[in-house]
Amino acid sequence: MSLPADTLLWKIGKKWISPFIKKFYRLEFSGKIPEPPFLLICNHVSPIDPFFITPYIDVPISWVIAQISFQNPIERYFLKKIGAVQKFKSRPDPAMLYSIYNILNQGGVVGLFPEGTITWTGDFQDHLISPKSMNKLILSLNVPIVAACIQGAWLSHPVWADHGRKPKIFVDFNTFSDYSAMEFIHHSEWEWQKKHLISYPGKSKAQGIERVLWICPHCSSFRTLFGKRNEVICSSCHNHWLIDDFGFIGGKILPDLFHHQIEVFSKWVQDLGKASFPSVKVSIRNDRTTNLIKSFHQNLTIENDIIQIGSIPMNILKTKGLNTHFRDILE
């Protein structure tokens, strides 16, 4: 009897794509994998994280994927062919839970990224996880919990970057029966890099930096940073910082610069009282199906915990979830 997700596409990928991925990304693995069924959890550092897992696991995995990824017809076709499970973000999803239980009861393997979205800074995203809900899920399954910690993938190609670097990726596996599995995947690329100092050389390492850094760390000007080759440059004060082969920006780590700008931006919004962004592209989708209702350009303002899109007000405090999709879309 075949396992769930044991499809022709999986067989082709396992035989032909996995060896290429393992060689190209210079993957190194450690740890043992139990016999199925089991739940696989993993930190989320790259859009292609599943491809870093598959070469080491000899059984097909049914990955839990955000429902919006199924909106593209081509993407939907391939996701269905590999037995992916749809998940609505930031709300209870009984259908997803039923699918997980059903796959495990059939002796299959389910792959899950508890963070739900790729890290922009290289640090694990604790704020996106409900320990109570995750612990409840783990205890209800009565199967081994295999934890996979991916290291080096984010530094090989930061999600904000236009170009990747020469990759070197490590994946460690361990098996648990409780919430301690979550501690195993709690990974910071930067703490790991400080310890190992692995070189990730590449060209134009700074291009795309404006997606994640918008405030100059020297003069605090807004939207003046840009990447040119391997340097981050401020068009206002003309300071510049080199991104070296270890990923450090002027000797500093990205999370420190990122959190500093959040503090500066928060104070700026408070002092200003109102922040305005002209002609923002807005897409409104059905809450249940995520089908597109309408798309338009409109002015956007932020004032007193209210995001105002034209004449449409949204209370920030009532927002259930926040996510950046495909690097350019804020959900």
Task: Describe each region flagged by the PLM.
Residues 8-44:
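Helix-to-loop junction immediately C-terminal to a conserved catalytic motif
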Residues 34-91, 252:
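Catalytic core of membrane glycerolipid acyltransferases/transacylases, capturing the structured
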Residues 109, 121-180, 200-206, 210-218, ...:
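A cross-family acyltransferase "interaction/gating" segment
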Residues 223-226, 243-244:
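Short, non-ligating residues that shape and space the ligands of small metal-coordination modules
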Residues 249-300:
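Anionic N-terminal interaction surfaces
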Residues 288-330:
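Phosphoinositide-binding peripheral membrane targeting modules
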